C-alpha cells in the first residue's frame, strides 16, 4: 500500500493554500505535517479525506480497494470531536461504527475500542459529562473500532493528558505495524520513526 500525491494544489476561499505538493507514504509509515498556523496542514488532511476538492494534481492510494474512494478507506480526525451530548459514550461510538462500516458492530468490538482509550468504565455516561480530554479519547476510539488503512489526524493529541497521549501512540504504532498509513498534523514529537513534511507560507519542503 502507498499513498502518493503528485503536484497537488489546493484553493480555499479564493486563496491558493499550496501548490506543487508531492510526496509518497508507504504502508507501515507515518508522515508528520509541520509548520505555522495557516500554511495548509489541515487543508491537506481535509483534501486527502475528500472534504476539500483537489484544485490540481493527483492523489492515489495503491494497494487498497481500487473501486473505493480514498475517503472511504480513511479515518479523518479533525478539530471537532463530533459527539452527541445526550448519547452515552457507548452509544456515540456505536453510532460512528455503524456509520463508518455501514453494518452493525459487535458489542465486544465497541468495548475493546473503549478499553483501548481508557473509557470502558464510562461507557454508560452521557457524553455531555465528559471532559475535553475524555471527549478526545472517545473520538479516537473510532480508530480502534473500525479498521481503515489510512489515518488522517489533525492535532490528535489536543486536550490529551500524558496517559491519553500514550494510548494514542500505542494505537498509531499498532496501526503502522499492521501495514497502515498515518498522516498527522502535530507539534508533538511522535515516539516512532516518521517522515516530516514541512509547510511554510512561501511553499513546502520535505525532510527525513
Language model features: what each stretch is:
Residues 151-155:
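Catalytic Walker B motif of ABC-type/P-loop ATPase nucleotide-binding domains
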Residues 107-122:
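Conserved ABC ATPase "signature" region
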Amino acid at each position: 500500500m502507498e499513498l502518493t500525491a503528485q503536484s497537488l494544489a489546493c484553493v480555499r476561499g479564493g486563496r491558493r493554500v499550496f501548490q506543487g505538493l508531492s510526496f509518497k507514504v508507504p504502508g507501515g509509515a507515518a508522515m508528520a505535517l509541520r509548520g505555522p498556523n495557516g500554511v495548509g496542514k489541515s487543508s491537506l488532511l481535509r483534501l486527502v479525506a475528500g472534504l476539500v476538492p483537489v484544485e490540481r494534481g493527483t492523489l492515489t492510494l495503491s494497494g487498497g480497494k481500487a473501486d473505493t474512494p480514498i475517503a472511504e478507506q480513511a479515518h479523518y480526525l479533525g478539530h471537532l470531536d463530533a459527539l452527541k451530548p445526550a448519547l452515552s459514550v457507548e452509544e456515540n461510538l456505536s453510532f460512528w461504527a455503524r456509520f463508518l462500516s455501514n453494518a452493525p458492530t459487535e458489542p465486544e468490538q465497541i468495548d475493546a475500542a473503549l478499553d483501548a482509550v481508557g473509557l470502558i468504565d464510562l461507557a454508560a455516561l452521557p457524553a455531555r459529562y465528559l471532559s475535553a480530554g475524555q471527549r478526545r479519547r472517545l473520538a479516537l476510539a473510532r480508530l480502534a473500532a473500525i479498521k481503515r488503512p489510512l489515518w488522517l489526524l489533525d492535532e490528535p493529541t489536543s486536550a490529551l493528558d500524558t496517559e491519553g497521549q500514550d494510548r494514542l501512540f500505542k494505537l498509531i504504532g499498532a496501526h503502522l505495524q499492521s501495514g497502515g498509513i498515518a498522516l498527522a498534523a502535530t507539534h508533538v514529537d511522535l515516539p516512532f520513526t516518521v517522515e516530516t513534511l514541512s509547510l511554510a507560507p512561501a511553499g513546502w519542503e520535505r525532510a527525513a
